UniProtKB/Swiss-Prot annotation:
GO terms for biological process: coenzyme A biosynthetic process. InterPro entries: ATPase_NBD, Type_III_PanK. Keywords: ATP-binding, Coenzyme A biosynthesis, Cytoplasm, Kinase, Nucleotide-binding, Potassium, Transferase. Homodimer. The active site is at D96 (proton acceptor). Catalyzes the phosphorylation of pantothenate (Pan), the first step in CoA biosynthesis. It is an enzyme of class 2 (transferase). Disulfide bonds: none annotated. It comes from Laribacter hongkongensis (strain HLHK9). The lineage of its organism: Bacteria, Pseudomonadati, Pseudomonadota, Betaproteobacteria, Neisseriales. ATP binds at D6, A7, G8, N9, T10, R11, L12, K13, T119. SUPFAM superfamilies: Actin-like ATPase domain. Its main location: cytoplasm. It comes from the Bacteria. This is Type III pantothenate kinase.
Length: 239
């Protein structure tokens, strides 16, 4: 069987490649405890392992030790699987973003702004021809809140909720950080649509996608595990 790995900043997601159109079952493991992955690979040794990683080389080595064989780590290229990379240095694009775009282009082709809301917030523009125009990277919600707490003497990291007009610091921090994420998403959708001269779709992925969807002024579609979907497509072909 073929094993797919999405090694993110905070955890590892993994799945066995499903046959045909079936959706793969996704598992998640913290980087400090890969026992479940190791046990699964002992029971069913993978014949091939494909992965996309944005984590450290030390963690990548630990992952390879757990699976018991070398991992084919995805390296972004100038083009692959119908997607064209706009980066000046294509291999400097994050492997997770590259896999997500391949997954999005094949799962739901069309003009779209692809948002991944996790540790970082990435906003990428992908047209219906598979051309990646470029994108932005910013701190995610958790990083924004923690950086504010660490950079100030008295604000701390209180639990708050989003309010239109916050009347306390906890809600003010949460609302301000969330607004700092939704505004650039809305702006990029408008900008890309104007550039193309036609409507574009908003695709949301990542752990904070449901929260963002609740507070965006535009509609978006949440699509889970696009990195693994992109890897699954690549596993069925060669670039």
């Amino acid at each position: 069987m073929i094993l797919l790995l999405d090694a993110g900043n905070t955890r590892l997601k993994w799945a066995w490649l499903a046959e045909g159109p079936a959706r793969h079952t996704v598992h998640a493991s913290p980087h400090h405890d890969l026992t479940a992955l190791e046990q699964a690979c002992r029971i069913t040794p993978p014949r091939r392992v494909l992965g996309a990683s944005v984590t450290s080389s030390e963690r990548n080595s630990a992952i390879m030790a757990a699976v018991g064989r070398p991992v084919e780590w995805l390296v972004p290229a100038a083009s692959c699987a119908g997607v064209t990379n706009a980066y000046r240095d294509p291999d400097r694009l994050g492997a997770d973003r590259w896999a997500q775009m391949i997954g999005a282009h094949h799962e739901q082709p069309g003009d779209q702004v692809l948002v991944s809301a996790g540790t970082a917030l990435t906003i990428d523009c992908l047209d219906r021809e598979g051309r990646f125009w470029g994108g932005t990277i910013a701190p995610g919600l958790g990083l924004l809140r923690h950086s504010l707490a660490e950079g100030t003497a008295r604000l701390g990291l209180p639990d708050g909720s989003w309010q239109e007009y916050p009347d306390n610091s906890a809600d003010a921090i949460f609302s301000g950080c969330l607004n700092a994420l939704t505004a650039p998403i809305e702006a990029q959708v408008a900008r890309f649509g104007s550039q193309l001269g036609r409507p574009v779709r908003l695709t949301l992925a990542g752990g904070d996608a449901p929260l963002l969807a609740q507070h965006l002024a535009i509609d978006g579609t949440i699509v889970d595990n696009l990195v693994l979907s992109g890897l699954a497509h690549l596993a069925r072909m060669s670039c």
